[in-house]
From Swiss-Prot:
<dbReference type="GO" id="GO:0006979">
    <property type="term" value="P:response to oxidative stress"/>
</dbReference>
<dbReference type="Pfam" id="PF00578">
    <property type="entry name" value="AhpC-TSA"/>
</dbReference>
<dbReference type="InterPro" id="IPR050217">
    <property type="entry name" value="Peroxiredoxin"/>
</dbReference>
<dbReference type="GO" id="GO:0033554">
    <property type="term" value="P:cellular response to stress"/>
</dbReference>
<comment type="similarity">
    <text>Belongs to the peroxiredoxin family. AhpC/Prx1 subfamily.</text>
</comment>
<dbReference type="InterPro" id="IPR013766">
    <property type="entry name" value="Thioredoxin_domain"/>
</dbReference>
<comment type="function">
    <text>Thiol-specific peroxidase that catalyzes the reduction of hydrogen peroxide and organic hydroperoxides to water and alcohols, respectively. Plays a role in cell protection against oxidative stress by detoxifying peroxides and as sensor of hydrogen peroxide-mediated signaling events.</text>
</comment>
<keyword id="KW-0575">Peroxidase</keyword>
<dbReference type="GO" id="GO:0005829">
    <property type="term" value="C:cytosol"/>
</dbReference>
<keyword id="KW-0560">Oxidoreductase</keyword>
<dbReference type="GO" id="GO:0045454">
    <property type="term" value="P:cell redox homeostasis"/>
</dbReference>
<comment type="subunit">
    <text>Homodimer; disulfide-linked, upon oxidation.</text>
</comment>
<dbReference type="InterPro" id="IPR024706">
    <property type="entry name" value="Peroxiredoxin_AhpC-typ"/>
</dbReference>
<keyword id="KW-1015">Disulfide bond</keyword>
<dbReference type="Pfam" id="PF10417">
    <property type="entry name" value="1-cysPrx_C"/>
</dbReference>
<dbReference type="InterPro" id="IPR019479">
    <property type="entry name" value="Peroxiredoxin_C"/>
</dbReference>
<feature type="domain" description="Thioredoxin">
    <location>
        <begin position="3"/>
        <end position="161"/>
    </location>
</feature>
Length: 193
């Protein structure tokens, strides 16, 4: 099953490092919550810890919005555990509160379209899945550029706003900014203000 915006997100079950322990985790465990699933290439690398730590340090902001963060790479759970035991000053991710999925058979990365087949690693994909399991947003970066936590939060806020209010969020929308109903009349009114 391929990842397609507007369709159910590909389901998965895998081992994951959760609160310092290896456990089985399924996407369905989070039904009823929004999920931001973000892929990264490898543990013990360079841009990856900056992203993971940035998301981890702001995890409460996502939880307050009813959203679960999930980090995923093709590394094993034991590799995740070893990396989690290395201090941040030494390039590790000690103190992770975000489940780290171990996609060792590459199925999740392949299903979400981020697997670099000949290298066996994932591109930097970020997927917003709503509380009904529908994929709402896909962003995929090449390896050398990290993602923005602020933009992930903005997109999450926008999708939750549109789901709740039935209005659309224009370009560069921020929480509290003007929105409008998806109609020609409301668009004209919005554009003239």
């Amino acid at each position: 099953m391929a990842a397609v915006v507007g369709k159910l997100a590909p389901s998965f079950t895998c081992k994951a490092l959760v609160d310092g322990e290896l456990k089985d985790v399924s996407l369905s465990d989070y039904r009823g919550k929004y999920v931001i699933l973000f892929f990264y290439p490898m543990d013990f690398t360079f841009v990856c810890p900056t992203e993971i730590i940035a998301f981890n340090d702001r995890a409460d902001e996502f939880h307050q919005r009813g959203c679960q963060l999930l980090a995923c790479s093709t590394d094993s759970g034991y590799c995740h555990l070893a990396w989690n035991n290395v201090s941040r000053k030494e390039g590790g991710v000690q103190g992770m509160r975000i489940p780290m999925l171990a996609d060792t058979n590459h199925k999740i990365s392949r299903d979400y379209g981020v697997l670099i087949e000949d290298q066996g690693i994932a591109l930097r994909g970020l997927f917003i899945i709503d509380d009904k399991g529908v994929l709402r947003q896909i962003t995929i970066n090449d390896l050398p550029v990290g993602r923005s936590v602020d933009e992930a939060l903005r997109l999450l806020d926008a999708f939750q706003f549109t789901d709740k209010h039935g209005e659309v969020c224009p370009a560069n929308w921020q929480p509290g900014s003007k929105t409008f109903k998806p109609s020609a009349g409301d668009l004209k009114s919005f554009m003239s203000s």
